[in-house]
Amino acid sequence: MKKNLYILSALFLAFSCNIARQISTSDFTPLNSFSQNCEGPAVDRKGQLYVVNYQKDGTVGRFQPDGKAEVFVTLPEGSTANAIRFDSRGDLLLADFSGHNILKINPETRAVSTFCHDIRFNQPNDICINRQDVIFASDPNWSNNTGQLWRIDKNGKATLLESGMGTTNGIELSPDEKTLYVNESIQRNVWAYSVSPDGQVSNKRLFFHFDDHGLDGMKCDRRGNLYVTRWGGGKIDVLSPDGKLIKSISTQGKQVSNLAFGGPDGRTVYVTLQDRKCVETFRN
């Protein structure tokens, strides 16, 4: 009997600890700090957070870890960014969906240039970049719920990797850069590809399918778990490297658009919310 009581007590304690460890978010920026296109969070080597469309469309905001904020750049007329990544030099690469470009920003001079423009682009939505500075870009056509997948080499040349996909949106590389993940917002699929260092993709397979809510930006943590923002669902779902749903993290807003990892240990998470027009944060 005592043994059974010990077992029950241990199970109750484990359950209680798990409840206590549930993650909750807090506001990193005030409500309504951004336009409704609040998106594209990325953290640089200094721990500074960059998010697009701060205060209004067509800007990039920069935030210190203590929350101090500024408009870092106003993009050229006709350009609206949706994603930010950093190359090996620390330059910012942006997916410019309204200008149909990949833009580059020098962080020291704040000069904006066009890194890639291709008339075949629908509207570049999200990007990721490997250690060889090869860019992968999702390119949806929201009018007919289709999408494309692109590779953009260091010389700015764009190569169409796949067309006829669903509504391509979130895109991410695994930490070892051997797997490329691409999701389809409307179809709720996450696809995985094998990828070589020079950006060749192969072995496409279905990594995970969701039954509800939209899919938006995705990021991997250092262990290779894939964090998928669930637009309209008010949560981030976390998938293990073998494609299992391991946890869900609730957000205060419903329209979760993207996330980024930061902090000295890489466990501070910044989340963009389009309905609340702000950034939420949590410790992972």
Stretch-by-stretch model annotation:
Residues 1-22:
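Bacterial Sec-dependent N-terminal signal peptides
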Residues 51-73:
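Beta-propeller domains
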Residues 63-68, 106-110, 152-156, 194-199, ...:
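Short loop/turn segments that connect beta-strands within beta-propeller blades
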Residues 59-61, 101-103, 148-150, 189-191, ...:
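A short loop-to-beta-strand structural motif that recurs across blades of beta-propeller domains
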Residues 32-49, 76-96, 101, 118-148, ...:
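Beta-rich, blade/repeat-based domains predominating
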Residues 29, 70-74, 113-117, 159-163, ...:
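Beta-propeller fold detector
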